[in-house]
Every structure is written in structure tokens, then in C-alpha cells.
Amino acid sequence: MKIQTLLIAFVVLCSSAFAQTKLVEKVVRKGNELVIPYEKYVLPNGLTLIIHEDHSDPLVHVDVTYHVGSAREEIGKSGFAHFFEHMMFQGSDNVADEQHFKTVTAAGGTLNGTTNRDRTNYFETVPSNQLEKMLWLEADRMGFLLDAVTQKKFEVQRATVKNERGQNYDNRPYGLAQEYLAKNMYPYGHPYSWLTIGYVEDLDRVNVDDLKNFFLRWYGPNNATVT
């Protein structure tokens, strides 16, 4: 897949000023250097784009990283970054409920999302001829998520996250070890003193408005890197 094609596809979706896109870094392999060559661009809307080409297989991997994780949560609202990761798969203005999963798998691809303390990322690996479709999916939920958020979806994912905490932490041998470790390593209120999964009482406390405010503050092209 040519670099120019990828750039045009995402710029058309996220920005109207292709000519202003800036190449800010280029790494080239020289000889037998152990280095991954790539080109790094910054779009006029602040989006960072990193491109690495490898034609050994007819596949493309798309990763969108938002520079926000559990460390950006407010005290009393822990677990929200991870909760929001779940909501990002529940449809957007032009993508129906659960359709994101169906579109990627129908294209012969795989997908997932992960959250840690400092970032949240979403990714797909698909046949290379499906690249533009993946970029469109990511652009749609970056720009057009909020109107598709409903109270019903919110409650379903709240229950899902609470169940995930029960399975992986509360009801698992030594599952709370990391939580106790974090509490003792960092003082109260430190953004690393709670786990990404959050506390059940905090998950019960948040509402749809909290979710929308979180999206508006952190989910935008100027806080994202596409690789």
C-alpha cells in the first residue's frame, strides 16, 4: 500500500487540508541496521500519522492510540477510561450497534482495544485492500460517536465491565495483588494508585454525561496517533 494512498484516505476523513500535512520525521534503514523505517506526519488538525511499509504479507495493521488512560481519571471516577474503551465498539452515527466487529471480521480481519494508565488504543489487522474501510471506521467513531450513545448501551457496558472486574480480580486467586501493590506504592490521589479496571463503587457512580464529557475532552485528532 502506497504511503500517498494512506495519507489521502485519512486526510479526507479527518481534515480538509492535505497540502498542509507536514512530514516531521523520516527514519531510513541503512545497510543492516536494526531499525524500523517509518515516516511521521502531522495533519493540520493535530493528528499524528506514522507509516511503516512491509510488503512481506498482503496485510495492513491500523492502530489508533489516544493519549489518555486511567491516570487522567478523576478521583471517584476510576475505571472510566477502560469503560469508555468498551463504548467505542457500540456503534457511531454511520455504524450500527455491533457493526464495527461485523465489518472487520467480514473483511477477514481481527480487532481489539486496550487501556493502560497512559493511553488507550484500538486496532485492526486486515487484508491490505481493506485499509480505507478501516480508516473510515476509525474516523467515524472519532468524529461521530456521541449521538449514537444511549442509556441502554451505557448500562450494558457498565455491567460488562463490572463482570470483567469480578472475573479477573475480585473472584480470582491473588487477583487483588496488583491493586494492593498500587495502593501501597503510590500515595492516595496519585493517578497510578488505582488500577485501570477501577472500583465497582466508582463504576456505579458515573453516568452518560460523564462519558460524553470524557469523549469531548480526550477523544479528538489532536490527541491521537494513527499508525
Q: Language-model segments: what does each one mean?
A:
Residues 20, 42, 99-227:
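Charge-rich, well-structured scaffold segments of protease-associated domains
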Residues 10-11, 23, 207:
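Detector for intrinsically disordered, low-structure N-terminal pre-sequences
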Residues 20-101, 123-126, 132, 136-139, ...:
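His/Glu-rich zincin catalytic helix
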